[in-house]
Amino acid sequence: MPIALPHDAKAGPTKAEVRSVLLGKLDLGADDHFAEVGSCTGAVTIEAARRAGRVTALERKADRLEVTEQNLAANEDSLAAEIDLRNAEAPAGLPDDADALFLGGSRNFESVLDHAVDTAVDRIVMNVSRLEVAGRATEAFRERDILEEVVQFQVSHGYELAGATSFNSDNPVYMLVGGASGSDDGSDGDDADDGDRAEATQ
């Protein structure tokens, strides 16, 4: 069932097709504790809360957290998880017992990965849209021995043009997938998370 997103934020929601791939990689179950860095509109938060037993979502911007809360309320009848929304930075605001982790932007991503390694997060997914950040993120995953795969994909939507069908293309998304069970450490991150999130949602 599609989710309802009546409220919006500047960066916009993660696109439905991207969410589908993301959820497939995370493979959330009823016993899982899912943690999210950068909830924004709450699109991923809502999808995860339909599948996981617990959801902890961080959003450092109060106005975006309010949008997350409003969109969660619009979908409350379909949510199964216990949800904890935190107006906090990562990694400081992250739980220590997450089974799965999603990074929706690149702010402090190396420190977040260090936390994931220290707490042995089983499934980690990070989305970025800028090539340079994707390169740095790939190296950071490799340095910590947590990289399983990098997926690059692009979605196009058809529209009618002169009685035929043409396509508008969304920006490409680079999805880094890994797991930190039994891995080692690293250091600091990139501050320009909004650029990745804004482009990945277009």
What are these regions (language model features)?
Residues M1-A30, A35, C40, E66-Q70, ...:
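Class I SAM-dependent transferase core
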Residues T41-A52:
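Conserved SAM-binding loop of SAM-dependent methyltransferases across substrates and taxa
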Residues R54-E59:
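Conserved SAM-binding motif I beta-strand of class I
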Residues D63-A100:
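S-adenosyl-L-methionine
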Residues A98-G105, R123:
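Short SAM/SAH-binding signature in class I
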Residues N108-A116:
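A short, conserved alpha-helix within the catalytic core of class I
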Residues V117, V121-Y174:
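C-terminal substrate-binding/active-site "lid" region of AdoMet-derived donor-dependent transferases
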Residues G163-Q202:
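Core SAM-dependent methyltransferase catalytic element
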